[in-house]
């Protein structure tokens, strides 16, 4: 009886014959089960089976009636892994957002430049008053700056008299640089003006060596050679060449690079309220006051409807194109400083080189400027030299070992 009771309680119940389970033995089996040794009933193997099931992420874990001791730790590990994966995904999306934002800024920079050069050229060709056009551009920029400061769209700076005195030379050369550029655009094609302006690195190297004592590296000197050679080749073969336009563009290079040298020489002290955009805004306001008396004394008042009509030009078109050109002039310089705050100076220089290529190509297409193969080759060499200069100017010479 004892052996049969133990046998009937074993896990192999399906092997029993149905005829042996009768009502004659209803109680003896359960009474013997209470004294069975633990090694007879096969319960211990079950936790090992439930351990293997609990180690997976499948829904079969709920099928086990015995909780696993390691389950909470495994859940915690999975929670930590998921928690650390979320910031990485957020960082990736954040980087992608910054890249898209930077790409949008570069596109705006190039687009504003294209529109400025096209509309500015049309106004200068019709009006023949570069000083008046330059004054209008400074005036529109000053109105925008005042509007931003009045509405607190940009923080209004607190400038001391000493800082204004230090900024004044920068405003003078900034005014002259834009005036000479407009004088050149009024005399020669847009593509030729920007080809000549590709010689800015040459003036930068010469002025930095003269006033700052910066000796150029052989790499920099090597990059200047194709710039000078390309501009010379393009100038010889330029259809619209005249000395007034050529010398005006050269003077623009000289004044613009003098501004960069002066900014290093004067060392304007900057605080939190005087960043690049604020400095540009102050220079624009000062340029307006510098340009106004010179314009009225030299050209008089030529932006009136009566004068424009006497020149045989549509008044509304001149006003509209002048306004668009002035807005684009101020916008592309603001965007340029925004890009400079996000990238390295080398990247900004490369972007500026690409911008010049885009402006030259777009102006040639829009104005249908005749370009000979030799002229295009010279322009290409000059721009390639500018690109090379932007890459090698940051290379520092190796220190001499004793």
UniProtKB/Swiss-Prot annotation:
Paired cysteines (S-S): none
Residue range covered by the transit peptide: 1-82
Compartments reported by the entry: Plastid, Chloroplast membrane
Transmembrane segments: 99-119, 132-152, 210-230, 279-298, 375-394
Pfam hit, one: TPT
Membrane topology of the entry: Multi-pass membrane protein
Any one GO MF annotation of this record: phosphoglycerate transmembrane transporter activity
UniProt xrefs under SUPFAM superfamilies: Multidrug resistance efflux transporter EmrE
InterPro entries: Sugar_P_trans_dom (IPR004853), Tpt_PEP_transl (IPR004696), TPT_transporter (IPR050186)
EamA domain segment(s): 118-236
Gene Ontology CC terms: chloroplast membrane
Chloroplast intermembrane side: 83-98, 153-209, 299-374
Spans within the Lumenal topological domain: 120-131, 231-278, 395-402
Entry keyword Chloroplast: yes
Keyword field: Chloroplast, Membrane, Plastid, Transit peptide, Transmembrane, Transmembrane helix, Transport
Similarity-based family: Belongs to the TPT transporter family. TPT (TC 2.A.7.9) subfamily.
Entry function: Mediates the export of fixed carbons from the chloroplasts into the cytosol in the form of triose phosphates.
Quaternary structure (record): Homodimer.
Listed name of the protein: Triose phosphate/phosphate translocator, non-green plastid, chloroplastic
């Amino acid at each position: 009886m004892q052996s049969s009771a133990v046998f009937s309680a074993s896990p192999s119940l399906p092997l029993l014959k149905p005829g042996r389970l009768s009502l004659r033995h209803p109680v003896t089996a359960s009474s013997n089960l209470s004294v069975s040794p633990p090694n007879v009933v096969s319960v211990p193997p079950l936790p090992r089976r439930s351990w293997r099931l609990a180690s997976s992420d499948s829904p079969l874990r709920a099928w086990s009636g015995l909780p696993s001791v390691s389950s909470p730790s495994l859940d915690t590990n999975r929670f930590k892994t998921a928690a650390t994966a979320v910031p990485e995904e957020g960082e990736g999306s954040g980087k992608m957002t910054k890249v898209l934002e930077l790409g949008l800024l570069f596109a705006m920079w190039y687009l504003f430049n294209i529109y400025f050069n096209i509309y500015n050229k049309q106004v200068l060709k019709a009006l023949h008053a570069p000083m008046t056009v330059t004054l209008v551009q400074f005036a529109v920029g000053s109105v925008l700056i005042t509007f931003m400061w009045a509405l607190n769209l940009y923080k209004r700076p607190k400038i001391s008299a000493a800082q204004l005195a230090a900024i004044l030379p920068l405003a003078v050369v900034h005014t002259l640089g834009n005036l000479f550029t407009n004088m050149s655009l009024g005399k020669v094609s847009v593509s030729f003006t920007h080809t000549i302006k590709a010689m800015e690195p040459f003036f930068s190297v010469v002025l930095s060596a003269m006033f700052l004592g910066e000796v150029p590296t052989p790499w920099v000197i090597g990059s200047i050679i194709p710039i000078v050679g390309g501009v010379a080749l393009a100038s010889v073969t330029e259809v619209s060449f005249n000395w007034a336009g050529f010398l005006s563009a050269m003077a623009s290079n000289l004044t613009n690079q003098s501004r960069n040298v002066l900014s290093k020489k004067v060392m304007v002290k900057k605080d939190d309220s005087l960043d690049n955009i604020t400095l540009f805004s102050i220079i624009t306001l000062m340029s307006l006051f510098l340009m106004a008396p010179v314009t009225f004394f030299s050209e008089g008042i030529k932006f009136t409807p009566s004068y424009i009509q006497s020149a045989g030009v549509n008044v509304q078109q001149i006003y509209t194109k002048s306004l668009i050109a002035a807005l684009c002039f101020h916008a592309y310089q603001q965007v340029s400083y925004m890009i400079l705050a996000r990238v390295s100076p080398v990247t900004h220089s490369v972007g500026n080189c690409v911008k010049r290529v885009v402006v030259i190509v777009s102006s040639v297409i829009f104005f249908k400027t005749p370009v000979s193969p030799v002229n295009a080759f010279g322009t290409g060499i000059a721009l390639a030299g500018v690109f090379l200069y932007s890459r090698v100017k940051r290379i520092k010479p190796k220190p001499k070992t004793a």
